[in-house]
């Protein structure tokens, strides 16, 4: 028996046949070899592949595809030339309609892990994009040199090798163009480029952001020090070659770190901010401001949150994890009052500014945690009808879930970017709430990410 058990264990470098059962949460194929779970990036459900083990972990193994014996009918040729090296997308080799089906399945699996019935009949089809390309409004590409040429891209996974990305197929065309213009000018002016291995040089990263609705573009150079040689010439060239660039910024980050931004940001030319609109709302975006990366699908996501809240105009709403106030402001016209909180004081300052600029008088924003503010407000006689949560990937704080169960608003609208933490939190809320439906939304086509809006109603 012991001998048999030993035989069934995989070893690094071993090749073996495997049938792919489903997609994992990171977009990898999941199969079983002699009852051991194996994660295989690039393999698709229903495929029969020959895989080679690359890593053994406790309870699972990782492998790579050596050969596809039987391909999925949904397998397509990834249009991006650096798709397999870059790692930014995980699902370009899967037909887009099937990506939407598989993302729903990822959500179903997450709920099955925490609940027996998995709520499958309540999980709706994923809302996708008509055109799932060139949707991202912001890029952060590292800068390097290759044979005297300036290149921009991302580091190959677990290496110092920079993959040259001349044209990213999920980036907005204007962000691609701005990056191309800037790298061309840096090369022409022979500006010093940071060398990651030697940790020497000046320009580290080019960050570009496009306001999709207004067409304004912002370029931020991340440098190791403040002095920028040929600064005036650089500015003049950028403005001449791409008039859409309305804001040229510089950020200084001298630390040996993979964190992009340093502490000091200042304007080189143009405006400090660019203007963007979402529906009827407009936002000022500074170099470091958080803003949703896919504005088109953000409108879809927020409209789903609005539908789930089912507002009549009389509701008091709490917007927990409110950030710069976007979801709350999206609902404010149809609510009696919106109160939001966030642990980041700068975000609260922006939320107040955004509310004021739009003329809202029924909003209130406080720095701190929802689990601190909510009991205080209830004590003062202010009780919410709807609580909207849009937490980070780790999900809601346990104390917030306990507070929601104590305060018992009529409805909870849960906006999530991580199906695993969503399913865990929803299970906790089901002590007092019933799930009416789960609506997956595809915010990032060709990646494994899936957002969800869940409507929970008090029992």
From Swiss-Prot:
The name of this protein is: Uncharacterized RNA methyltransferase BCE_0542
- Provide a Gene Ontology MF annotation, just one: metal ion binding
Instruction: Please list the residues that bind S-adenosyl-L-methionine.
Output: 292, 321, 342, 390
What NCBIfam families does UniProt report for this protein, alphabetically? rumA
Q: Which Pfam families would you find in this protein's record?
A: TRAM (PF01938), tRNA_U5-meth_tr (PF05958)
Family, as annotated: Belongs to the class I-like SAM-binding methyltransferase superfamily. RNA M5U methyltransferase family.
Report any one BP term from Gene Ontology: rRNA base methylation
* EC main group: transferase
What is the species listed in this Swiss-Prot or TrEMBL entry? Bacillus cereus (strain ATCC 10987 / NRS 248)
Recorded E.C. number(s)?
2.1.1.-
The protein's UniProt keywords, in alphabetical order, are:
4Fe-4S, Iron, Iron-sulfur, Metal-binding, Methyltransferase, S-adenosyl-L-methionine, Transferase
What are the positions of the active site? 417
Database matches in InterPro entries = MeTrfase_TrmA_AS, MeTrfase_TrmA_CS, NA-bd_OB-fold, SAM-dependent_MTases_sf, TRAM_dom, U5_MeTrfase_fam
Boundaries of each TRAM domain copy? Answer: 9-67
What residues bind [4Fe-4S] cluster, as annotated?
80, 86, 89, 168
